[in-house]
UniProtKB/Swiss-Prot annotation:
Residues 325-349 have a biased composition (Acidic residues). Disruption phenotype: Worms show impenetrant phenotypes, including developmental arrest, morphological defects of the vulva and tail and reduced fecundity. Worms also display supernumerary seam cell divisions, defective alae formation, and the accumulation of the SCF(lin-23) target, the glutamate receptor glr-1. Increased levels of the neddylated isoforms of Cul-2 and cul-4. It is found in: Nucleus. InterPro entries: ARM-like, ARM-type_fold, CAND1/CAND2, TATA-bd_TIP120. Key assembly factor of SCF (SKP1-CUL1-F-box protein) E3 ubiquitin ligase complexes that promotes the exchange of the substrate-recognition F-box subunit in SCF complexes, thereby playing a key role in the cellular repertoire of SCF complexes. Acts as a F-box protein exchange factor. The keyword Iron does not apply. This is Cullin-associated NEDD8-dissociated protein 1. One of its GO terms (biological process) is SCF complex assembly. HEAT repeats lie at residues 41-79, 127-167, 375-413, 500-540, 617-655, 671-709, 1000-1038, 1041-1078, 1079-1117. Residues 320-349 are annotated as: Disordered. Interacts with cul-1, cul-2, cul-3, cul-4, cul-5 and cul-6.
C-alpha cells in the first residue's frame, strides 16, 4: 500500500463525519489482517497518532475499531519496536485516568496489544515492549495509588503480561509479587481476585527461592488467622486458601512438598460446627475447592490424608443444615409438599448448596486421580453418592450424578475387557476355566485379575440400589433426566449385563423423558444413545415386554422436527429392528407395521435433511429385509422409490447399500427396476468415487447370488459384466477382489452373460498376474474364479490347455516377474488343474514341469515356476504323485537346494512343505530324515517343516492328519531344539515359530521342556525359547491360554537377562501379550514394569563409533531395545492401565520426549496424548516438564547440508508436536492458564513455518474422517 493511500486513510480518520472515520478504521483493519499493507516509518507514526486520537472518539464503534487496529499493529513485523514503545508511553497514563470511560478504553487497548505481541522467544521487540510496560504498571500500583477501579484494570493488565511473558522479566518478579500479595488483603473482592490470578501466573515462572518464600508467607498468614473468629477473618482466610490453591494449580509438582502443610488447615475449616458457624460456608467451599486442586495436581501427597479427606468430603456432600430430607418412603408420599418447600429457598437465602457442589467436584477429582484406590473409593464413596441423588438443588444433583459417572468411567478404564470375560450360557467354555459368578453373570478369571473382579463385585453390589434410585430420580426430577440417562449409558458400557433385570422399569421412565415437550434436543440425543447401547448389549428376549414403549420412543424421535434427533432416531431404529425380528412371534410383527408408518414417511419425503434421508433409506431396507412377509403390500412402492434414490447422486451410495440388504433377504426388484438400476451401475463403476464403485459391485454380486433364474435382465447384466475387465488392476486390489467375486457368481449362475467378455477378462487377469502385489484376498478370489470357469459350461469356453497356456504365458514369454507373481501364477495353474478333476491331466502337467526344471537351458523364471507349481499340485491334488509315478518332486526339491538361485532354493523349501501338507504320511518322514542327514541345508528344510506346522496349527481338516502329525511331534521337537542355537537369525526365527506352534498342540508337556531351555548358557537358545511364546499368543480364546498363563512369567523374566538380544525378544513377547491377551501378563506387571522402564534409558556404553570410509558414524546398539521398551509402555497403557503407576510412567515418558531418536520421539508423543486422555491431572501437574522438550523440538532447524529425507523427518516431528499441543488444548482446557503451554501454543501460531505446518495438520485430520461408513445393520 502506498504512502498516498495511507495518507488518505489518516485524513479520513479525522473527518467530522463518523461514517468516514468508521470506514477508514475498517479499511485499515482489513489491510492489517490480510497483510496487504507495509507501513513506512513516517506513515506508521501518522497512523498511530490518528488511532490514539480515535480512542477518544464520540462514536463507540469507531473506538472499538481503533482498539482492534492498535492490537493488530502489535503483531510481529507490522511496525518497529520504537513505535510499540511509543504506544505504551502514550496509552499507559490514561489507565489511571479518573474518567471511567477513558480508563476502560485505554486498558482494553493495552490488553489488545499484549494479546497480539509475538512470543518472547521469537521476538526481541516483544521483550523490549514488555520490559517497558510491566515496570510502569507495577510502579503505578505501589507509588501512584490510583483509585480502586483503576487498580482492577492495572492488576488485570499485569496478569496478562505475566501469563504470556512472565519469563521475559525475571528482574520484575519480586516487585510484581509484592504488589500482588499486598492486594490480597483489599476490601474489594474484584481486586483480590485479580491479585490471586496474578500470583498464579507468577507462580509458574518465578525461581525456586522466591516460590518457596511466597508459599511460606501465605502459610504463615494462614496459621496466624486460624481459626477464624470474625466475618473479616473468614474473608481473609478464604482469600488465602484460594491463593494457595491457585499457586498449586499453576505450578503443579512444584507445590508437592508444601501440600502436606496446607491440607490440615483445609480439613480443619471443614470441621467447624455448622450449627453455630453458618457464616463459614464460603470458607468451607474454598477449602473443598482447594482439596480438589490438590487431588488433581498433587494426588500422591494427599494419599496420607485419604481417610480423613473422604470422610470430610462425604460429610460435605450431605451438608444441608437448613433442610430435612426424611426417609425415602416419606419422600414419595410428600413429593408435592417437598417441591413447594424447595421454592422457599433461593441462592441468596442459602448458600450451602455451593458447599455440596464443591464437595461433589472434589470427590470426582479424587476418583479420577486416585485410580490405585478405586476399589476402596467405590466401596466407600459409591453408596454415599447414590444416597445423595435425592439432592433438592438441580445444579448440585447434576454434579452428584456426574461423580458416579466418573466412577463408572474409571472402572471402564481399569476393566476394558469385561464383555470378553463374560461366559454365555450357551457358550462352549473351556473345561478348566475358573468361573466366577457376579450379579448373576458368569465371568472367566482367565480374562480378569482378582482386583478387577473385586471392582466389578463392588459395582454389582451397588447396582440394584443405584437403578432403583436413578429410576425414581428420573420420575421425580425431569430436568436432570438426561443426566440420569448419561449415567445409565455409562453403566451399560462399563457393566453390560447390569441393566438386564431392571429394563422393565427403566425403559418407560426413559420414554417419558424423550416424549416430554420441554426436553431439549441434546437431552433427546442422550436418551437415544442410551437406547442404542441397551439394544446392542442386551439379549433381545429382555425386551419382550417393552416393545410398545420402545416403539413409542422410535416413532416419537423419528418424527421429531429437529433433523439431528430424527436422524439419530432412525439410526437407533436400525438396531431396534434386529430386536423386533428376534421377537416377531411375541408382537414384533405388529410393532414393525407401526414403525414402518413413520420410517416410510421420512423415506418418501424429498424435503428432508440429507442425513435424515440417508438414515431413512437404511432403516426402510432393514425393515423390509426383516419383515418381508409382513410388509408385502408396502414393498412395491418402497422398491420403486429406492430405484429413484439410486438414480440421484446425493443418495445413490446409501441406496445401493440398502438395496444390497434388500436383495440379500430374497426380495426381488421388478425387471423394469433392475434395468434402471443396472444401467446406473454401468455409469457408476466408471466414476472416480471408490466407495460408490465398491458398493455397486457388492450389489451386483449379491443380486446374482440371491436372485432366481430369469429375474435379472440379461442385456443390462451383460453390460455390467463387460465393465469388470476395466476394474481388474493392481492399483486397487480391494475393488479387484470385488470384481472377481462378481465374475465368480456370473460364471456359476449367468455364464451366457459373462462368456461374451471372456477374453478381455482373461487379458486383465494375466496383466494382474505379473504384479508383485497379487496375494491375499484378491488371489483367493481369483482362484475361486478359475474354479468357477473350469467347472461351468458356457459358449466358446477355453480348453484346459488353452486356459493354462494363457495363465502361464507371462512365465514363458520371459516377462520379468517377482517371486510373488510366480507363486500366484503357480497357484492358478494348480487350481485350474485341480478343478478339472482329471488325474491324468495333473500328472501330465507334473511331468512337463519336472522336465522343464531339469532342463539345463531353461530360464530361472521357468524353473522357479515349475518348482512352486509341483509343490502346489502336491498340496491340492496329492494323488498326482503315486508311488509308481516316475516324477519324484521331493528329490527335485532337494536337488534344487544346491542351485545358485536363492529364490529357487526358497521355492523348493516351500514346495517340499506343500507336498507334506497334501500327503503328510509320505513327505513328513522324508523332511525329518533330511533334517537329520543334511546339516548344511537345515535352514531350507526347517522352512519346509514350518510350512507343515503352520498348516497343521490352523487346519480345519479332519483329525486323521492331525493325529498323524501329533505322533511325530517328539521327533520334530528334538530337531528344532538342535537348531535353536544357530548363529543365523533367520534359522532361529523359523525354529522359534515352529516351537511356539508345536507347544499349542500339547502345552502341558511341551511348555516345561521349552522352559528348561531358558537355563541354557547359550543366549541364542534362550532367545529362541522366549520368542516361541509369541506364536502361542493370539486374541482368540484357546485352551493353551490356561497353561500359558501359569508359565509365561518364567519366560518374561528374560527382560532382566544379561544378553541384550534376549531382553529385546522378551519385550517383544510382552508387548504382543499385552496387545492380544492382556490377562496373561496383567498380574506380572508389578515385577516386570521396573525392568521395562530400565530399558528405556539411553546407555552411552552401547553407542559405538564406526568408520565408514573417510567418515565416522555413531551406531546405537541399544536403540532397538529402547524402542521395544517404549512400544511396550504404549501398549500397556491401553490394556493394563490398572497395573500402572501413572506418576512413575509419566516420568519415564518425559525422558523419552527428549530422546535423540526420531521413532522414539514419535512414539512418546503418542503416549503423551494417551496419558492426557486417561490421567489429565497427571499431565497438568507436569505440564512445565512436558512443554520444554516439545518447544525444543519446534525450534530445531535443519542442517545447512541436510538431505531431503532429513528435512522430511524433522517436519514429521514438528507436525507430531503440533498434534500433541492441539490435542492437549482440546482435552485439557485448564492448560491454557499455564504460561509455558501458552508460550508453546503462541510459538506455533506466530511462526510462519509452524503455522503452515499446523494448517497441514488440520487438513490431514479432516481428510482422516472416514466418509465411506457402512450402513448400520446392528
Amino acid at each position: 500500500m502506498s504512502a498516498y493511500h495511507v495518507g488518505q486513510l489518516v485524513d479520513k480518520m479525522s473527518n467530522p463525519d463518523k461514517d468516514f472515520r468508521f470506514m477508514a478504521c475498517n479499511d485499515l483493519m482489513k489491510d492489517l489482517q490480510t497483510g496487504t499493507i507495509a507501513l513506512e516509518d513516517d506513515s506508521t507514526a501518522k497512523v498511530i497518532r490518528a488511532l490514539i486520537k480515535l480512542l477518544s472518539d464520540s462514536n463507540g464503534e469507531v473506538q472499538n475499531l481503533a482498539i482492534k487496529c492498535i492490537g493488530l499493529l502489535a503483531q510481529p513485523s507490522k511496525i518497529k519496536t520504537h513505535h510499540l514503545e511509543y504506544l505504551v508511553e502514550e496509552l499507559t497514563p490514561h489507565v489511571f485516568s479518573k474518567a471511567e470511560q477513558s480508563r476502560d478504553i485505554h486498558s482494553l487497548t493495552l490488553k489488545a496489544m499484549i494479546l497480539n505481541l509475538a512470543p518472547s522467544a521469537s521476538s526481541n521487540a516483544t521483550t523490549t515492549v514488555v520490559k517497558r510496560m510491566l515496570p510502569k504498571f507495577v510502579d503505578s500500583l505501589s507509588l501512584c495509588a490510583p483509585d480502586d477501579a483503576a487498580r482492577v484494570d492495572v492488576l488485570d493488565l499485569i496478569g496478562e503480561v505475566l501469563l504470556r511473558f512472565g519469563d521475559v522479566v525475571p528482574e520484575m518478579h519480586k516487585g510484581s509479587l509484592k504488589v500482588m500479595v499486598d492486594h490480597l488483603y483489599s476490601f474489594r473482592s474484584a481486586i483480590r481476585k485479580k491479585a490471586i490470578t496474578g500470583i498464579g501466573h507468577l507462580a509458574s515462572v518465578i525461581n525456586g527461592e522466591l516460590y518457596d518464600e511466597l508459599v511460606q508467607d501465605l502459610l504463615k498468614e494462614l496459621a496466624q488467622r486460624s481459626p477464624p473468629s470474625s466475618a473479616a477473618q473468614n474473608v481473609q482466610l478464604r482469600t488465602l486458601v484460594i491463593a494457595l490453591s491457585t499457586v498449586a494449580r499453576a505450578s503443579g509438582s512444584r507445590f508437592s512438598k508444601h501440600t502436606p502443610k496446607v491440607v490440615p488447615f483445609l480439613l480443619q475449616y471443614l470441621q467447624i460446627d455448622p450449627g453455630t458457624e453458618s457464616e463459614h460456608d464460603d470458607l468451607r467451599e474454598a477449602s473443598i475447592q482447594g482439596l480438589e486442586v490438590f487431588l488433581y495436581r498433587n494426588p500422591q501427597e494427599v494419599v496420607a490424608f485419604e481417610k480423613e479427606v473422604i470422610q470430610q468430603l462425604t460429610d460435605a456432600l450431605a451438608y444441608d443444615p437448613n433442610y430435612e430430607y426424611g426417609d425415602d418412603d416419606e419422600d414419595e408420599q410428600m413429593e408435592d409438599d417437598e417441591d413447594d418447600d424447595e421454592d422457599e429457598y433461593s441462592d441468596d437465602e442459602d448458600v450451602t448448596w455451593k458447599v455440596r457442589r464443591a464437595a461433589a467436584k472434589a470427590i470426582e477429582a479424587m476418583i479420577s486421580s486416585h485410580r490405585e484406590s478405586l476399589l476402596n473409593l467405590s466401596q466407600k464413596i459409591g453408596p454415599v453418592v447414590i444416597g445423595r441423588f435425592k439432592e433438592r438443588e438441580e445444579t448440585v444433583r447434576t454434579e452428584i450424578i456426574s461423580v458416579y459417572i466418573a466412577l463408572l468411567n474409571q472402572i471402564s478404564i481399569l476393566v476394558p475387557d469385561l464383555q470378553k470375560a463374560v461366559v454365555a450360557a450357551d457358550e462352549d467354555s473351556i473345561e478348566t476355566d475358573d468361573i466366577v459368578v457376579i450379579g448373576g453373570t458368569k465371568f472367566s478369571t482367565n480374562y480378569l485379575s482378582r482386583s478387577q473382579l473385586a471392582i466389578i463385585q463392588s459395582l454389582a453390589d451397588q447396582k440394584d440400589v443405584l437403578l432403583r434410585t436413578i429410576t425414581k430420580s428420573m420420575k421425580k426430577h425431569p430436568k436432570t433426566g438426561p443426566k440420569c440417562i448419561e449415567l445409565l449409558s455409562a453403566l451399560i458400557r462399563t457393566y453390560p449385563s447390569g441393566l438386564e433385570d431392571s429394563l422393565d422399569d427403566i425403559i418407560p421412565a426413559v420414554s417419558n423423558i424423550l416424549t416430554d415437550k420441554n426436553a431439549s434436543a441434546q437431552g433427546k440425543m442422550t436418551v437415544l444413545s442410551f437406547i442404542s447401547n441397551a439394544l446392542t448389549l442386551n439379549n433381545p428376549k429382555r425386551f419382550k415386554n417393552l416393545l410398545s414403549p420402545l416403539t413409542t420412543i422410535m416413532t416419537h424421535s423419528i418424527s421429531e422436527p429437529f433433523y439431528k434427533v430424527s436422524a439419530e432416531g432412525l439410526a437407533v431404529c436400525c438396531k431396534y429392528i434386529d430386536v423386533l425380528r428376534e421377537l416377531s412371534a411375541c408382537g414384533g410383527n405388529e410393532e414393525a407395521k407401526k414403525l414402518l408408518v413413520v420410517v416410510e414417511k421420512k423415506f418418501m419425503a424429498n424435503d428432508t435433511d440429507q442425513e435424515v434421508r440417508e438414515r431413512a433409506i437404511s432403516a426402510i431396507s432393514m425393515l423390509l429385509a426383516a419383515f418381508k412377509d409382513v410388509l408385502k403390500n408396502e414393498t412395491p412402492a418402497i422398491l420403486e422409490k429406492m430405484t429413484e434414490r439410486i438414480g440421484r447422486d446425493m443418495t445413490c451410495l446409501v441406496a445401493f447399500r440398502a438395496s444390497t440388504h434388500i436383495v440379500e433377504a430374497g426380495i426381488i426388484f421388478s425387471s423394469a427396476q433392475l434395468q434402471s438400476i443396472l444401467r446406473h451401475v454401468v455409469d457408476y463403476v466408471k466414476k472416480i468415487a471408490r466407495s460408490l464403485r465398491m458398493t455397486c459391485l457388492n450389489f451386483v454380486e449379491k443380486l446374482m447370488k440371491h436372485s432366481p433364474a430369469g429375474s435379472i435382465p440379461v442385456e443390462e447384466l451383460t453390460c455390467v459384466l463387460g465393465e469388470m475387465s476395466n476394474l481388474i488392476s493392481e492399483t486397487d486390489l480391494q475393488i479387484t477382489n470385488q470384481a472377481f467375486c462378481c465374475l465368480t457368481y456370473a460364471f456359476l449362475n449367468f455364464p451366457t452373460c459373462v462368456s461374451l467378455h471372456m477374453q478381455p477378462i482373461l487379458d486383465s487377469i494375466i496383466r494382474l498376474l505379473t504384479s508383485p502385489l497379487i496375494q491375499g484376498l484378491a488371489l483367493n478370489s481369483l482362484l475361486n474364479l478359475f474354479t468357477a470357469i473350469v467347472k461351468t459350461d458356457f459358449p466358446e469356453k477355453p480348453t484346459f490347455e488353452s486356459l493354462l497356456d494363457s495363465v502361464t504365458s507371462p512365465v514363458y514369454d520371459n516377462v520379468a516377474l517377482s517371486r510373488h507373481a510366480h507363486m500366484a501364477i503357480a497357484s492358478c495353474a494348480a487350481v485350474i488343474t485341480e478343478s478339472t478333476q482329471n488325474l491324468e491331466k495333473s500328472r501330465s502337467l507334473a511331468k512337463k514341469l519336472a522336465q522343464q526344471l531339469q532342463t539345463a537351458n531353461m530360464s530361472d523364471s521357468i524353473r522357479l515356476f515349475a518348482m512352486i507349481t509341483l509343490g502346489e499340485l502336491g498340496r491340492r491334488v496329492p494323488d498326482t504323485y503315486s508311488p509308481d509315478f516316475p516324477v519324484k518332486p521331493e528329490d527335485l526339491a532337494i536337488k534344487a537346494f544346491n542351485h545358485h538361485h536363492e529364490d529357487l532354493k526358497s521355492a523348493a523349501a516351500q514346495a517340499l512343505g506343500a507336498l507334506a501338507v497334501g500327503n503328510l504320511n509320505v513327505y513328513l518322514p522324508f523332511i525329518l530324515e533330511q533334517i537329520r542327514t543334511q546339516p548344511k541345508k537345515q535352514y531350507l528344510l526347517l522352512h519346509a517343516l514350518k510350512e507343515v506346522i503352520v498348516w497343521e496349527s490352523s487346519s480345519e481338516e479332519s483329525t486323521k492328519s492331525t493325529d498323524l502329525f501329533r505322533s511325530a511331534i517328539v521327533d520334530i521337537w528334538g530337531m528344532l531344539m538342535a537348531n535353536a542355537g544357530g548363529n543365523e537369525d533367520g534359522t532361529r526365527s523359523v525354529v522359534a515359530e515352529c516351537l511356539g506352534r508345536l507347544c499349542s498342540f500339547d502345552p502341558e508337556s511341551l511348555l516345561p521342556k521349552l522352559k528348561e531351555s531358558m537355563r541354557s548358557s547359550d543366549p541364542a537358545i534362550r532367545s529362541s525359547a522366549v520368542s516361541a511364546i509369541k506364536y502361542m499368543i493370539n486374541d482368540e480364546k484357546r485352551i493353551v491360554d490356561i497353561t500359558l498363563q501359569k508359565q509365561i512369567g518364567d519366560f518374561l523374566a528374560a527382560v532382566r537377562d544379561e544378553d541384550l538380544k534376549v531382553r529385546r525378544v522378551a519385550l517383544v513377547v510382552l508387548n504382543s501379550a499385552a496387545h492380544n491377551k492382556p490377562a496373561l501378563v496383567r498380574d506380572l506387571l508389578p515385577d516386570l514394569l521396573p525392568a521395562v522402564y530400565e530399558e528405556t534409558k539411553l546407555r552411552k556404553e552401547l553407542i559405538k563409533e564406526v568408520e565408514m570410509g573417510p567418515f565416522k558414524h555413531q551406531v546405537d546398539e541399544g536403540l532397538d531395545l529402547r524402542k521395544c521398551a517404549f512400544e511396550c509402555m504404549f501398549t500397556l497403557l491401553e490394556s493394563c492401565v490398572d497395573k500402572i503407576d501413572i506418576t512413575q510412567f509419566s516420568s519415564v515418558m518425559e525422558v523419552g520426549l527428549s530422546d535423540q531418536n526420531h521413532d522414539v520421539k514419535l512414539l512418546n508423543y503418542l503416549t503423551l496424548q494417551r496419558v492426557a486422555n486417561l490421567a489429565p491431572g497427571q499431565v497438568l501437574q507436569r505440564i512445565d516438564r512436558v512443554c520444554e522438550p516439545l518447544k525444543t523440538q519446534l525450534n530445531v532447524r535443519p542442517r545447512g547440508n541436510a538431505v531431503k529425507q532429513e528435512v522430511e523427518k524433522l517436519e514429521e516431528l514438528k507436525k507430531a508436536v503440533i498434534r500433541v499441543v492441539y490435542g492437549l488444548k482440546l482435552k485439557l482446557p485448564e492448560v491454557e492458564r499455564n504460561p509455558q503451554f501458552l508460550d508453546l501454543y503462541n510459538t506455533i501460531k506466530h511462526t510462519k513455518e509452524l503455522e503452515a505446518l499446523a494448517n497441514d495438520v488440520l487438513k490431514e485430520s479432516q481428510r482422516a474422517v472416514v466418509y465411506d461408513t457402512p450402513m448400520e445393520t446392528a
